[in-house]
Design a protein with these regions (language model features):
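A short glycine-rich, Lys/Arg-flanked "PGG" loop and its adjoining helix->strand segment in the class I
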Residues: 130-142
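Conserved SAM-binding loop of SAM-dependent methyltransferases across substrates and taxa
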Residues: 56-68
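Substrate-binding/catalytic lobe of Class I Rossmann-like enzymes that use SAM or dcSAM, i.e.
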Residues: 152-248
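A short acidic, Gly/Pro-enriched loop at the edge of an enzyme's catalytic core
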Residues: 106-115
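Conserved Class I S-adenosyl-L-methionine-dependent methyltransferase catalytic core
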Residues: 1-40
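Conserved class I S-adenosyl-L-methionine
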Residues: 45-55
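Conserved beta-strand signature within the Rossmann-like core of class I S-adenosyl-L-methionine
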Residues: 143-151
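Class I SAM-dependent methyltransferase SAM/SAH-binding core
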Residues: 65-106
């Protein structure tokens, strides 16, 4: 947690923000993103919401702050993030409205009116895409709403990309796989799920990554004191630059 606390924004959100004007702070851009995810289809009183992939709880806490009559369950497979979110739930007195659950989504049971999935699909792995959508259908109530934010790769690049291991898969997210827009449309259609694209955020992701890289380098001495090497610094800078270049 300490590593990410040094260079992420105040909400500790490790996914793209949404820059409407380009002049927002990183924290403001993350809150824009949260608002965009629910705009036009806001949670209703009494909704029981599931978030798959809690991170440090920023989206779940945002929802609870805006909608006082909902409940949220959020899943994680990170013990550190579980401990962090659990402590914050107690600190904010939200035990009756929010649960953080240390569990793989494939093992979870329940019925939810809304399910959110923010930049976790990339880590599912192509061999589990159908398993993932099967589970979403099982957990979602009839007429429920499923919303996700994911990184995609151009349709024309997908087949070549899927046949090899790139830098991200080797060093950052082993087993990960980006979908393409056509692949997402296909799997949504096969699973009888509605599909629409709300926001395309390539420029926002570029800005997010550039701010992360700036923050990382400004805080490097503190990060180094946590036990990270100069070799790690070079690798992390390459990772952030590699990704930001991909969104330009």
């Amino acid at each position: 947690n300490r590593f990410y606390e040094e260079w992420l924004d105040d909400t500790l959100t490790y996914s793209s923000g949404y820059f409407k004007t380009g002049n927002e702070t990183l924290t403001q851009a993350q809150e824009n993103k949260f608002a965009s995810l629910i705009k036009g289809n806001e949670p209703q009183p009494g909704d029981h919401i599931l978030e798959i992939g809690s991170g440090w709880g920023s989206f779940a806490f945002y929802l609870l702050s805006k909608f006082p009559s909902i409940k949220v369950d959020t899943l994680t497979i990170s013990q550190e993030q579980f401990n962090f979110v659990q402590a914050k739930i107690k600190e904010l007195g939200l035990q009756d409205r929010m649960k953080v659950i240390y569990r793989d989504y494939r093992e979870h049971q329940g019925q939810y009116s809304r399910i959110y999935f923010i930049e976790m699909f990339e880590a599912v792995g192509i061999q589990y895409w159908q398993t993932y959508f099967d589970k979403v259908k099982e957990l979602l109530k009839p007429q429920g709403v499923f919303s996700m934010q994911t990184i995609v790769i151009f349709d024309g690049f997908f087949e070549r990309y899927a046949k090899k291991i790139d830098f991200i898969q080797k060093y950052i997210f082993p087993g990960g796989m980006l979908p393409s827009p056509q692949k997402l449309q296909q799997i949504a259609r096969e699973n009888k799920l509605g599909y629409f694209v709300k926001n395309q955020m390539a420029e926002s992701y570029y800005q997010t990554l550039e701010l992360w890289r700036t923050n990382f380098n400004q805080k490097w001495q503190k990060i180094k004191n946590l036990g990270y090497s100069d070799e790690f610094k070079r690798m992390w800078n390459f990772y952030l630059s590699y990704c930001s270049g991909g969104f330009k």
